[in-house]
Amino acid sequence: MIVPKHYENLNVLHENTMPHRAYYMPASKDMGSLVHDREKSDRMKLLNGNWKFQFYKSIYDLQEKFYEAGYDTKGFDEIPVPGIWQNYGYDSHQYTNVRYPIPLDPPYVPQENPCGAYVHQFEYKKDSKAPKAYLNFEGVDSCFYVWINGVYVGYSQVAHATSEFDVTDHLKEGTNTLAVLVLKWCDGTYLEDQDKFRMTGIFRDVYLLKRPESVLYDYFITTSIGENGAEIEIRANFLGESNAAENTKIVIRNHEGNTVATGTFKKCDDENFAYKAVLDITAPVLWNPEQPYLYQVLFLSENEVIIDRIGIREIHCEGSVIYINDVKAKFKGVNRHDSDPVTGSAVNMEQIKKDLIMMKQHNFNAVRSSHYPNSPYFYQLCDEYGLFVIAEADNESHGTQTQYLKNSEWENVVEQWNKRIANNPDFIPATMDRTRLCVEREKNRPCIVMWSMGNECGYGCTFEESLKWTKEFDPTRLTTYESAFYQSTDREYDYSNIDVVGRMYPAFSEIDEYMEKNPDKPLLLVEYCHAMGNGPGDLEDYFELIQKYDSLCGGFVWEWCDHAIYKGQAENGKGIYYYGGDHGEEIHDGNFCMDGLVYPDRTPHTGLKEYKNIYRPARVLHYDQGTGDMVLHNYMNYVDLKDYIYLIYEVSVDGEVDCVGQIELDESIPAHEEKTIKLPVSIPDSGKCYLKVSYCLKNNTQILHSDESLGFDEILLKNIDGRNQKTIELLAEMNTDNIFTVEECDRYFTIHVGQENTYRFNRLTGLFESITVKGKELLTRPMELNIWRAPTDNDRKIKLEWMNAHYDQSYARAYETSCITKNGKLHILGTLSVSAPTVQKILDVKSEWIITSDGAIQVKMDVKRDLEFPMLPRFGIRLFLNRDFDNVEYYGIGPEESYVDKRRAGSHGKYDANVLEMHEDYLRPQENGSHTDCDYLILKGQENTFAAAGERTFSFNVSPYTQEELTAKRHSYELQPCGSTVVCLDYVQNGIGSNSCGPELSEQYRLDAEQFNFEIKMIIK
């Protein structure tokens, strides 16, 4: 082997790396903040580009010293840096959530450890004013060895952290050769078991910094706010001569470029820093996510300028309530991985910008860097755009939980889980190192309000030490660590340095229980509302709970984006996206990585639109339509609604806009307060009337444009006849001279309605199997009673019960049917059941079909459920219409899909679409495209019209795909249209929830009543 086995040595985490420091970008002169264009610094040389590359399936296959000066690399391939080697055909992708992809045997990894040899040549010119050279790697997975010009430089690990080497003595004037050996696995792999695709390579920027001999090396900026202004304390360490500190001038400028404070460093008595400066700013403008005001700080020395930014803000807890700038904080957050379907975990600034801008557009104010440090400019952008950040260390050892145990009781699992790593003293140095790499590099970012020690590692001495160091080093921020929740009985644990209790996916009852105990620490939902596929469905309920308790400081939805690998375009034009199991890997977790609010290409899921409106900046708490008094509450943390938004209101009648107006708020409504404003509207006597109040941005921000809608409220208005008038029209019977003729046999009732309509009713199923109008058959398959839906990702647990109950194989069975004519109408009475193979009857149904002389069919069903069975996915009627029924009109909640617990993205109205537009194309096919609270549905074909309406509202789906097709296929590009327009008319569907990883579906959204009735009318023309 050509390298020492540092990769299996817990005592060698780094070799020859520089001490941890804050991130900054030096230059020879004032070149601006260098956030968006750091490569413009004249002291930075970016080494990204195409590098020579050779892949080896095993480190034992690498026999030649490829790093030696003059080594011939003509047999090497080329690969882009930054980049992931799996994306270029080397090795293969693997997605696993909890389980390690290797045996659980720390610190050892498989002997056949894949590796990649990188070689890159670059030019270097010495600078007498900046003779020192530092080589920076911002992200390499999993570990790497470095050589320059054939001479060994050093070794490092921790994939998502910066490794810096002093390479001054290794460089020469002119052409230099950099060689890097990257290994797929190392002992650090056991601490990098995050829920993501396992990707390898140099995936972040590589660059050289030129610096003077004597220089500011590290600094820590903290701010405090007093009655007379703000105090800025800057502690620092210097390299080189002792006069470097006194020769460094500090200048602070405001956003407008005016100098507001100056100072110099003086020696201080501090455990971590040798120098300190204290500067005062009078009448400071504070930083917060809604008004992210940043000052600029310049460190000026003879041969170097460092420019950074300061956000003045103060964080503290009073009891169990978090205050930021003396305001009770509520985190409206989301978890974010570095992920792109083409570039994988190698994401650049533009990709990060797109994510953060979308977050701001959808009313997020916080992001958790799950579960590792991001690129340094991620945090700088959060400073600038206005997002709170929970900065998380690169530490997850969740796979230790899955070790094989005879005793699989949870208490024993936790005890053994903790012993492996979290409570193993051998891992204290590695855990401390990862914590410090996170904290030290980003310590100057005002957006960071909380340090997280990691994710799902269990708890023990490693984290006790890390938390203790963090609180001592940075008492200005809060700490959290969710896995402290997992306690074993082998010892007493120290939780004193955890400020915020973190929990994942708690049920509402658990939150209530925590709050009832009058906790002394805030509760944070570090992960909640699992957004996998069609979901989440419980956002509004969590929002209400977060508002109910001051001690519940908010939460972070899991997660931002679907993780998938783009594989090109299918013949049908759809994108091909691979997830776990699509790459030939044996150990994988399927599509559990497809759990975001946006698709891999950042197209929003309906769940993201749902989130945006639930977390709108204001809400109407009450509206008195008699007086026009409207109580408006400000849900922002800092801004006054008067300065932030204006209102657009509209009154719609049966989906048609009746009046529109605009209101400028002329009175102050401070954050967290409410005020009554006047909004009188005229309301017609008849029709379903809604008042929609939209909240529009008043002025441009750096991210958002004026007039953008930030959300809306919808209020049902009362009038004399509040029914939808089109529905009344559809429900009304048309007077005709048609007479009924019925042909009866053991199997069928064949009903002729006048000369044009013929219906065949199957007496064995109790349902129609043929509807003919003017000789044209409208049904392509018999009608069905339908209780199945293609399981959503959030049905992944309950679907096992559903399939065990054979819901997916259920069908209608009639026991008796009779046909009578009464009052000019034909009545078909039936007693039937919904049954399935191997199990008892699921449902008993009493049905009455009423056919009127105009050919309309009305059905009334009384349903009784056997309580032995689980909740139903849905209940309704499924029809297969000719595919020329392509034009859809409906009145209900749209245009986004809607369900009983996922309906805030849309509003009541009249909508038009074609059938394909009604389909939400989730990459793993599942139930989608439902619309709830509907008054009527109309489908128009080339010659005929089919409509449905009810005295009570109903739910429906219209799709080119069957639920069987959606159930069977693993990818959306595999879906085949069935050749019909599939129409599901539902009493209701079961709720969506977030039970793929979260709590069970709330009771109020379950279709589990013992008895219910369903009534709907179908109009055929």
Question: Where are each of the predicted segments found?
Answer:
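Beta-strand-rich binding/interaction modules
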Residues: 148, 230-266, 629-634, 638-662, ...
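An acidic-aromatic loop/edge-strand motif
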Residues: 87, 92, 99-108, 157, ...
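Intrinsically disordered, low-complexity Pro/Gly/Ser/Thr-rich segments with frequent PxxP/GP/PP motifs
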Residues: 265-282, 655-686
